From Swiss-Prot:
Disulfide bonds: none
Protein's name in the database: Arginine--tRNA ligase
Annotated source species: Nitrosomonas europaea (strain ATCC 19718 / CIP 103999 / KCTC 2705 / NBRC 14298)
GO biological process, one term: arginyl-tRNA aminoacylation
PANTHER family assigned: ARGININE--TRNA LIGASE, CYTOPLASMIC (PTHR11956:SF5), ARGINYL-TRNA SYNTHETASE (PTHR11956)
A cellular component annotation (GO) from this entry: cytoplasm
Domain of life: Bacteria
Gene: argS
Catalytic activity: tRNA(Arg) + L-arginine + ATP = L-arginyl-tRNA(Arg) + AMP + diphosphate
Cited Gene3D superfamilies: Arginyl tRNA synthetase N-terminal domain, HUPs, Isoleucyl-tRNA Synthetase, Domain 1
SUPFAM superfamilies: Anticodon-binding domain of a subclass of class I aminoacyl-tRNA synthetases, Arginyl-tRNA synthetase (ArgRS), N-terminal 'additional' domain, Nucleotidylyl transferase
């Protein structure tokens, strides 16, 4: 068995160039060196624009500087040559033997291949989804879930200690609206007819919860039935109420008064039901969290009051029109924000300040919030509050996720939420499957609009990217199954036999895998993994169509099987990072 330490060719080339720069330009030590993968194979395996960057600063000819740097490069066991291209790019060409021998390192590393120490064990909390527990998750939540879960996997592979957190908005007005909606549906089951508010929650799940309550409790919550309906009807038909939102708030207040302690029971029931449904939906989608953090706990623990007091102590609050305002314009926001209303109730922003204070006090090195793109305007006030609390805003990053738009038969699928006619994540998963949903959701950068083609996601064709990648994995499993040998035999591969251009391309893709994971972690970009997998699958399919594997030459057979076994290993790893299965047969 050949024992091979996993080489890092990119870092090696950077070290060579750094040593050359120290020799040619001793006064320019510590300059940052970056290497990129050239688009054209003729330009080598890695390329650097170092000479052009330094030439501008030093007022020297970039071509001459590049040649001087190449002339000063130390000898290397894995670099064949370096040359100058274009206006001063320095291109590195790896030795064929270095690429060939890399195969052994991949096979020996096994499932850990692709992992790196980029994060150096630093802790990062990734908060994502955090949907109001007021109804089933919809397809917009699904994209945030797929993005966050995939990114958490990628960050873990890149050496970060990741904590996944779901912030449960269980203390706000929306939960009161859902409780009211469920109670009104329940009253209808009790034979108490009432005009249902247009801006209440109207989905079938509301009726289902009402039915469950009625079956378990009978008419227990139909308090003072005739008087109840009269009071609710008066509010519903009043012409003195300025807006439908105010009308809904009056109905909520009436419900709390009528039900008294029973209101809390109903509130807890609908919260428990919706949270359980959300957890199950996400778990079935392959998305799990270490922490489910309750907004209500911030009030119960006094954290909200403490956060507001901290701002007050810094003279950053003032009273106006009976409300308490935060001077957020002092920190770049477009206007000041209310943290406590004139009725004494704290705003959602106040609890959000407390929540972020809690995050900082829990000691994470980095914090990443994944929000829907519609929350873009919320960023300045949150960042401002963090700065106002004398916390480091640089530790918090906010990534925005655009909503996905579904298409069926080439036509846009309509979606709404309050009416109950929306497309749920569960419905999407049932139609296209978890694998297609997870993969399609991360095919684009998170801040770009995503057109989700339902017909394509269900098709078994090479046009379907997830099918294309999974089929490559299954094809390899089929070949290895036909061979039937023990996989430890593959360690005997004679890598010098891998001379076909298609084989060298596959080896190069393997070399790129760790760099791709690191780039996806740095750029918060799971789509880079999806792109990589599509490219690797494409190169394999081309190789498969032009190559025989189970040949009579034993050495050549074992070597080719070792190569595709490594491809299978990387395909499986990449799919796992994205929460997608790697089927052995299709």
């Amino acid at each position: 068995m050949v024992t091979t330490t996993l080489p890092d060719f990119k870092s090696h080339c950077i070290q060579l160039l750094d040593q050359a720069a120290r020799q040619v330009l001793p006064d320019e030590v510590g300059v940052q060196i970056e290497l990129l993968r050239p688009k054209l194979a003729d330009h080598g395996d890695y390329s650097s624009n170092l000479a052009m960057k330094l030439a501008r600063r030093l007022r020297r000819n970039p071509l001459e500087l590049a040649k001087a740097l190449i002339g000063a490069l130390p000898d290397s066991s894995c670099v064949e040559k370096a040359d100058v291209a274009g206006g001063g790019f320095i291109n590195f060409f790896l030795k064929k033997t270095a690429k060939q021998q890399f195969l052994h390192a991949v096979l020996q590393a096994g499932d850990s291949f692709g992992h790196s120490r980029l994060g150096a064990g630093k802790t990062i909390q990734i908060e994502f989804v955090s949907a109001n527990p007021t109804g089933p998750l919809h397809v917009g939540h699904g994209r945030g879930a797929a993005f966050g879960a995939s990114l958490a996997n990628i960050m873990t592979a890149a050496g970060y200690a990741v904590t996944r957190e779901f912030y449960v908005n269980d203390a706000g007005r929306q939960m009161d609206i859902l409780t009211l909606s469920t109670w009104l549906r329940y009253l209808d089951l009790c034979g108490l007819s009432f005009s249902f508010p247009a801006n209440a929650y109207r989905g079938q799940y509301v009726a289902d919860m009402a039915s469950e309550i009625y079956q378990a409790q009978g008419d227990r919550y139909a308090h003072r039935s005739d008087a109840t309906i009269r009071q609710l009807t008066e509010i519903s038909t009043s012409t003195t109420i300025d807006s439908e939102d105010e009308r809904l708030d009056r109905l909520i207040t009436a419900a709390k008064s009528i039900l008294d302690q029973d209101y809390a029971d109903l509130h807890n029931f609908v919260l428990t039901e919706q949270l359980a449904d959300c957890r199950n939906d996400l778990m079935e989608f392959g998305v799990e969290f270490e922490t489910w953090f309750s907004e209500q706990s911030l009030f119960d623990s006094g954290m909200v009051a403490r956060a507001v007091q901290l701002l007050d102590d810094k003279k950053l609050l003032y009273r106006q029109d009976g409300a308490l305002w935060f001077r957020s314009t002092d920190f770049g926001d477009e206007k000041d924000r209310v943290v406590q209303r004139e009725n004494g109730l704290y705003t959602y922003f106040a609890s959000d300040i407390a929540y972020h204070l809690s995050k900082y006090e829990r000691g994470f090195d980095y914090l990443l919030n994944i929000w829907g793109a519609d929350h873009h305007g919320y960023i300045p006030r949150v960042k401002g509050a963090i700065e106002a609390l004398s916390l480091d805003p640089g530790r918090l990053e906010i990534a925005l996720v655009q909503f996905a738009v579904l298409y069926r038969d080439g036509k846009k699928v309509s979606m709404s939420t309050r009416s109950g006619e929306f497309v749920t994540l569960r419905q999407l998963r049932q139609e296209v499957g978890n694998d297609a949903a997870r993969f399609f959701y991360v095919l684009r950068k998170s801040d770009q609009h995503l057109d989700f083609d339902l017909d394509l996601a269900k098709s078994q064709s090479n046009d379907n990217p997830v099918y294309y990648v999974q089929y490559a994995h299954a094809r390899i499993c089929s070949v290895l199954g036909q061979w039937g040998g023990a996989e430890d035999i593959l360690a005997r591969a004679e890598t010098e036999l891998l001379t076909d251009p298609a084989e060298l391309v596959l080896l190069q893709k393997m070399i790129d895998f760790t760099d791709t994971i690191e780039a996806a972690a740095k750029e918060r970009a799971p789509h880079l993994i999806a792109f990589f997998l599509r490219e690797l699958a494409g190169e394999f399919h081309s190789y498969y169509n032009s190559t025989r594997f189970l040949v009579e030459d034993e050495s050549l057979k074992i070597t080719r099987l070792a190569l595709i076994s490594a491809v299978r290993q990387i395909l499986s790893k990449g799919l796992t990072l994205l929460g997608v299965t790697a089927p052995r047969e299709m």
